[in-house]
Amino acid sequence: MASRDLAESLLPVGGGAATATATATAHDEYDERAYDSDDKVSIAVSDSDSEDGGGGGGDAMRPAFSWRKLWRFTGPGFLMCIAFLDPGNLEGDLQAGAAAGYQLLWLLLWATVMGALVQLLSARLGVATGKHLAELCREEYPPWATRALWAMTELALVGADIQEVIGSAIAIKILSAGTVPLWGGVVITAFDCFIFLFLENYGVRKLEAFFGVLIAVMAVSFAIMFGETKPSGKELLIGLVVPKLSSRTIKQAVGIVGCIIMPHNVFLHSALVQSRKIDTNKKSRVQEAVFYYNIESILALIVSFFINICVTTVFAKGFYGSEQADGIGLENAGQYLQQKYGTAFFPILYIWAIGLLASGQSSTITGTYAGQFVMGGFLNLRLKKWLRAMITRSFAIIPTMIVALFFDTEDPTMDILNEALNVLQSIQIPFALIPLITLVSKEQVMGSFVVGPITKVISWIVTVFLMLINGYLILSFYATEVRGALVRSSLCVVLAVYLAFIVYLIMRNTSLYSRLRSAMTKST
């Protein structure tokens, strides 16, 4: 019964309430838009799609299911799922497999389910309001809070991009047999924004097709590895359904959960769903869009889950319980695979590198895409596409080049840096999830598409759980890597400000906050 209520609450609430788009104000002529009207994809597959069926009333019925219509909506979910397949996730997968074998597959499954819930809410927000999360944050919060949220999101983007670009650079180094150094791979990867701009000029569907090819490359590469290494099917199934967690695999468990929810991906998905031409004055059309986006997002995440399973089980079969298990990472995983399995159909080292390159390239380009929406939405900047892409690319590529020049992939310091980058992204998660849940729970924002009470409660439980998991990661890093009384004291002050901001975001829409604010206003 609870699962049925949850499913129903992810669809619009019935009744005569006006649609969210009827209550939302139209975009100002000078406001930043996710997509111009000329760039949007038509979803009409028949003459009935342009008729006035359904209207905007509360009794409007969603049009009948159509496979052709689903195909028209397919795309945004697959761009979104790339964040579940970035080099950081692949590293978490291989380390979990090497350190814990098949034992953490159940956690990977449920982490993906939690990620799916977050992304479905993000898509719902974008469709129902006609605006993406960054824009709505600018309207919801005062200027100082908006700037703070923007800064936090940009930091998360930079942290993710460094890992993604380094992942691509490692793959290029492997494929070039070491001819191209790490910094050279970074330079090559830096030009991916030009590929992005080139494809974007040819339309959204061409861009989506390009990402579809990259996902297919990953799926084929890692499926070939799965076939060559032949992991145990029985242990795989047991790992999926039987929860196991030991003290020695806590770090890998935290890594799996922490990598799934990427802050910038929440902002990205709410913008991507606006790439279709939807008559937002008709409730039935908005309801239809939410329905199809839910389906295609779930299908995309099933694909990403399959790829993550392949990577985890390959390294579980090859390295669980071995001497290499503790020291394996992106930079040496290919060599270890080659030593273990040699050459069968094609050198497994290069199969790994091809999959890693597809992962790195796709995630860096989607990072650039997300950066455009984040900057434009929070700051209300209307810039030319090429200029926004160059600015957002520069934010990340400069620190990445510094990392590539001063660190070697086999240097132990690189592991510390990766851990620091994971922490950097972890601390940003509340600043994406709290505004998201706050907004989808407000009838003034969502209209009749406001989420139901069961979905709201589950969403807050997931958010608190993720915050606790990532809090553990932060405290672990603080205890093991932070040295010096002055540095620790400074970080304690920063932590206090950080927690205060989180409390503010949570309490801002409560009656207690309203009473406190009213009392403070009267006292002044």
Curated annotation (Swiss-Prot):
Coiled coil: none annotated. It is a multi-pass membrane protein. GO terms for molecular function: cadmium ion transmembrane transporter activity; manganese ion transmembrane transporter activity. Its main location: membrane. Keywords: Ion transport, Iron, Iron transport, Membrane, Transmembrane, Transmembrane helix, Transport. One of its GO terms (biological process) is iron ion transmembrane transport. The chain crosses the membrane at residues 70-90, 98-118, 155-175, 179-199, 207-227, 253-273, 295-315, 341-361, 389-409, 420-440, 457-477, 486-506. It is found in: Membrane. It comes from the Eukaryota. Pfam families: Nramp (PF01566). Residues 34-58 are annotated as: Disordered. The keyword Iron-sulfur does not apply. InterPro entries: NRAMP_fam. One of its GO terms (cellular component) is membrane. Signal peptide: none annotated. Belongs to the NRAMP (TC 2.A.55) family. Probable metal transporter. NCBIfam families: nramp, Nramp_1. This is Metal transporter Nramp2. The lineage of its organism: Eukaryota, Viridiplantae, Streptophyta, Embryophyta, Tracheophyta.
